[in-house]
Amino acid sequence: MPSHKSFMIKKKLGKKMRQNRPIPHWIRLRTDNTIRYNAKRRHWRRTKLGF
């Protein structure tokens, strides 16, 4: 990835960075909760973004 990024690429990278985090702990504590972890976590070396 070049150091001079276009704004659109930078915006997409920022969104993917925000998506790639664990779920908040208080969500796990809610009643009738089935979500245990973020199924869409992405590792930077295993799965590439494709742009």
Swiss-Prot record:
Pfam families in UniProt: Ribosomal_L39
Gene Ontology CC annotations of this record: cytosolic large ribosomal subunit; plasma membrane; vacuole
Taxonomy, superkingdom: Eukaryota
Biased composition (Basic residues): 7-19
Zinc-finger found in the keyword field: no
Keywords: Ribonucleoprotein, Ribosomal protein
GO molecular function: mRNA binding; structural constituent of ribosome
Gene Ontology BP terms: translation
Region: Disordered, residue numbers: 1-21
Family: Belongs to the eukaryotic ribosomal protein eL39 family.
Name of protein: Large ribosomal subunit protein eL39z/eL39x
Organism: Arabidopsis thaliana
